């Protein structure tokens, strides 16, 4: 009979007082229902909002604001508790995909594998912490809180370069490369693209884009956005009429990827 991975033998572990916001949202990605439900229950009892996914592909949808899993939530989860061995998209590939898209959400990886190599690979791929099964629920909660504190207290940094697939944008230099070929963009085109690249997959309405780029005092038409998106597509898309970077979300606005 398989032992319960949520071993409660760590009675001597010091209980860490709550430090993270009770509104913090945690995504639990685990294919074993017993473990998934138990982890979700423990975190909910600690005051967190919890979403669950049984595989990596479903979990990735929580980072797309137009997906059914994300619902009405427009922000990414604050933390991901991620099993290493998952169907569809495994834990390592999940980390790679998120980090490649510029998503910096803290990730706590869970695994029955306990070799140094496994831990190092997980951390180098993009996980922020690694917890070996079986584990105590107190340690799980303590590690979640530590990761949330670290991410909430970390000052926002302006990266030297923003990357999305073949695009590279240098904020300080106002330069954009597409497949290492430099592009010539107007100031508004540059700021639009920078906003999209800082928030990949987030859907922006025309009004939101106008306020962010043109300012709240702008008195023009929202079709200004459509015109600038068309110009951007002509510069970054292989086929502007069938874009792969700047996508239209019908009835709402635009997103990158």
From Swiss-Prot:
Residues 25-148 form the Response regulatory domain. Phosphorylated by SphS. Residues 159-257 bind DNA. The lineage of its organism: Bacteria, Bacillati, Cyanobacteriota, Cyanophyceae, Synechococcales. Pfam families: Response_reg (PF00072), Trans_reg_C (PF00486). One of its GO terms (biological process) is regulation of DNA-templated transcription. It comes from the Bacteria. Keywords: Activator, DNA-binding, Phosphate transport, Phosphoprotein, Transcription, Transcription regulation, Transport, Two-component regulatory system. One of its GO terms (cellular component) is cytosol. PROSITE patterns: OMPR_PHOB, RESPONSE_REGULATORY. Gene3D superfamilies: 3.40.50.2300, 6.10.250.690, Winged helix-like DNA-binding domain superfamily/Winged helix DNA-binding domain (1.10.10.10). It comes from Synechococcus elongatus (strain ATCC 33912 / PCC 7942 / FACHB-805) (Anacystis nidulans R2). The modification 4-aspartylphosphate is found at residue 83. Member of the two-component regulatory system SphR/SphS. Response regulator. Involved in inducible production of alkaline phosphatase in response to phosphate limitation as it is directly involved in the regulation of phoA transcription in response to phosphate limitation. Binds to two distinct sites upstream from the phoA promoter. The gene is sphR. This is Alkaline phosphatase synthesis transcriptional regulatory protein SphR. GO terms for molecular function: phosphorelay response regulator activity; transcription cis-regulatory region binding.
């Amino acid at each position: 009979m398989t032992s319960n991975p949520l071993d409660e033998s760590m009675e001597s572990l010091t209980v860490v007082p709550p430090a993270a916001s009770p509104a913090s949202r945690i995504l639990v990605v685990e294919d074993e229902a017993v473990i998934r439900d138990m982890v979700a229950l423990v975190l909910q009892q600690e005051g967190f909002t919890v979403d669950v996914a049984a595989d990596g592909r479903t979990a990735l949808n929580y980072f797309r604001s137009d997906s059914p899993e994300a619902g009405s939530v427009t922000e990414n989860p604050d933390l991901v508790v991620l099993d290493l061995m998952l169907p569809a998209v495994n834990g390592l590939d999940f980390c790679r995909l998120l980090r490649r898209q510029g998503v910096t959400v803290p990730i706590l990886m869970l695994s029955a594998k306990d070799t140094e190599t496994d831990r190092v690979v997980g951390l180098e791929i993009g996980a922020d912490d690694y917890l070996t099964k079986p584990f105590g629920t107190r340690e799980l909660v303590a590690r979640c809180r530590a990761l949330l504190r670290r991410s909430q207290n970390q000052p926002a940094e302006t990266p030297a370069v923003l990357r999305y697939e073949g695009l590279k944008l240098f904020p300080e230099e106002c330069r954009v490369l597409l497949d290492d070929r430099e592009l010539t963009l107007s100031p508004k085109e540059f700021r639009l693209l920078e906003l999209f690249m800082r928030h990949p997959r987030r859907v922006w309405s025309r009004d939101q884009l106008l306020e962010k780029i043109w300012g709240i005092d702008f008195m023009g038409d929202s079709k200004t956005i459509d015109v600038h998106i068309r110009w951007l597509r002509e510069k970054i898309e292989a086929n502007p009429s069938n874009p792969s970077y700047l996508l239209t979300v019908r009835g709402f606005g635009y997103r990158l990827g």
